[in-house]
């Protein structure tokens, strides 16, 4: 159990401490359901996680630092496993309606089995997007290798949406696009009939190579959905009215079993008070004010730019304003920016300070330094020390900060469509 002191919430003002087709139909037994997550023990690669985050939000790196001659990167071929073989690890206790959600590459990504038209597909739950799309048999055969693909022809409930298309395109020209259909989707025993699903006929190599996941379940706001000519609702929006409460909770612990849970806020999963902050959903993200930060025992500082943040389960790292990143690594012994790694690195035996970031206008949420040590990345040629890649990296001056799984797994998090709002509490 985490100690309450490890997950402090500071009151900023007083510095007090407290921790278009037929409308989709939803069916949810018990009016709540959960998607469990089980830890895996594979290796991770920090620069890859950072590149994926940059690709997702169209961020172009501009920072330069030490080059490849300063350290020897580890060979990333040690990363093994595919989304196809993750399905065999799934457990489905009938009495709870629970399904497994695996953390792959030591928390580099969280994936979960989803049933589409009777076919079980491992996918990524992503609060930073709003499209439900899946790798499928309409893609070229070469793009299907290593993936578990959805076959529309084998689903008796699949219906093509004539004239409808979707397109996800990122700043570096990564993409997925194609047609759209509807089908019955089951997640943890909760079923939506007529869920809109992107059926790409073309995807970029970045999606082909990501064999840990076969698609995305977008859990952002439906205004972010890319389906044309008429936007479609997310799975969360479609299931919301059938739930006891229109909420999703994320309990993404790094040291054991955790879960996503819909329809209920389980008070046995957290301790102490929960803070709730207003979300600005106008851009389609779970976005809130985040204008302050605090490194270790230092003073509370103000961020002049990028004073908003989003909570994003589809991103591994914390991508923060350069002011925060530079101030943080100034307190990390031996830290330096490495252009070959794409971010800040430091000797792995360095003890990292805690980092507190503002959540809303009144509160700071503290992430323990142990959570911010993301991955080993190589060997220092001069000292022979193992070098690590930080879980905090630059957002390269973009308009928002991105709080990914490095942040989220430190808390019990509530995504609440009422308001909307986000709640944070210290997890048990």
Swiss-Prot record:
Domain Peptidase A1 residue range list: 110-425
One Gene Ontology biological process: proteolysis
Region forming the signal peptide: 1-19
GO cellular component: extracellular region
Sugar-bearing residue positions: 276, 380
Chief location bin: secreted
Propeptide: 20-90
Cysteine disulfide links: none
Protein EC: 3.4.23.-
Compartments where located: Secreted
Active site positions: 126, 312
MF (Gene Ontology): aspartic-type endopeptidase activity
Listed Pfam families: Asp
Keywords for this protein: Aspartyl protease, Glycoprotein, Hydrolase, Protease, Secreted, Signal, Zymogen
PANTHER family: ASPARTIC ENDOPEPTIDASE, PUTATIVE (AFU_ORTHOLOGUE AFUA_2G15950)-RELATED, BETA-SITE APP-CLEAVING ENZYME, ISOFORM A-RELATED
Sequence similarity: Belongs to the peptidase A1 family.
Name of the molecule in the record: Putative aspergillopepsin A-like aspartic endopeptidase AFUA_2G15950
Organism of derivation: Aspergillus fumigatus (strain ATCC MYA-4609 / CBS 101355 / FGSC A1100 / Af293) (Neosartorya fumigata)
């Amino acid at each position: 159990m985490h100690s309450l002191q490890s997950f402090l919430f500071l009151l900023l003002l007083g510095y007090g401490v407290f921790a278009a087709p037929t409308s989709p139909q939803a069916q949810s037994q018990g009016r709540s359901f959960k998607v469990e997550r089980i830890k895996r023990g594979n290796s991770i690669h920090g620069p890859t996680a950072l590149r994926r985050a940059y690709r997702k939000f169209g961020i172009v790196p501009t920072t330069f630092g030490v080059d490849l001659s300063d350290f020897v990167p580890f060979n990333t071929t040690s990363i093994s496993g595919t989304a196809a073989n993750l399905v065999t690890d799934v457990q489905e206790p009938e009495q709870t309606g629970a399904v497994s959600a695996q953390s792959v590459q030591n928390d580099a990504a969280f994936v979960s089995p989803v049933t589409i038209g009777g076919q079980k597909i491992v996918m990524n739950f992503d609060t930073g997007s709003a499209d439900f799309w899946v790798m499928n048999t309409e893609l070229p055969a070469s793009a299907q290798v290593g993936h578990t693909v959805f076959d529309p022809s084998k689903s008796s409930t699949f219906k093509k949406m004539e004239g409808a298309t979707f397109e996800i395109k990122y700043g570096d020209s990564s993409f997925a696009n194609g047609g759209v259909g509807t089908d019955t989707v089951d997640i943890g025993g909760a079923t939506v009939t007529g869920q809109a699903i992107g059926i790409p006929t073309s995807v970029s190599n970045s999606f082909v190579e990501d064999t840990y996941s076969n698609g995305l379940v977008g859990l952002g706001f439906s205004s972010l959905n890319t389906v044309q000519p008429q936007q479609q609702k997310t799975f969360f929006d479609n299931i919301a009215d059938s739930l006891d409460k229109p909420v999703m909770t994320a309990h993404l612990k790094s040291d054991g079993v955790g879960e996503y849970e819909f329809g209920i806020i389980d008070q046995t999963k957290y301790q102490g008070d929960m803070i709730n902050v207003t979300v600005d959903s106008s851009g389609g993200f779970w976005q809130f004010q985040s204008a302050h930060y605090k490194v270790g025992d230092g003073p509370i500082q103000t961020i002049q730019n990028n004073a908003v943040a989003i909570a994003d389960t589809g991103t591994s790292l914390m991508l923060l304003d350069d002011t925060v990143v530079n101030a943080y690594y100034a307190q990390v012994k031996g830290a330096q920016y490495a252009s070959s790694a794409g971010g800040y690195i430091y000797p792995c035996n360095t003890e990292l300070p805690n980092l507190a970031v503002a959540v809303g206008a009144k509160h700071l949420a503290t992430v323990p330094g142990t959570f911010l040590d993301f991955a080993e990345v190589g060997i220092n040629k001069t000292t022979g020390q193992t070098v690590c890649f930080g879980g905090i990296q630059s957002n390269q001056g973009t308009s928002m900060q991105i709080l990914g799984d490095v942040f989220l797994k430190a808390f019990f998090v509530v995504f609440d469509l009422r308001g909307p709002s986000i709640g944070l509490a210290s997890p048990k």
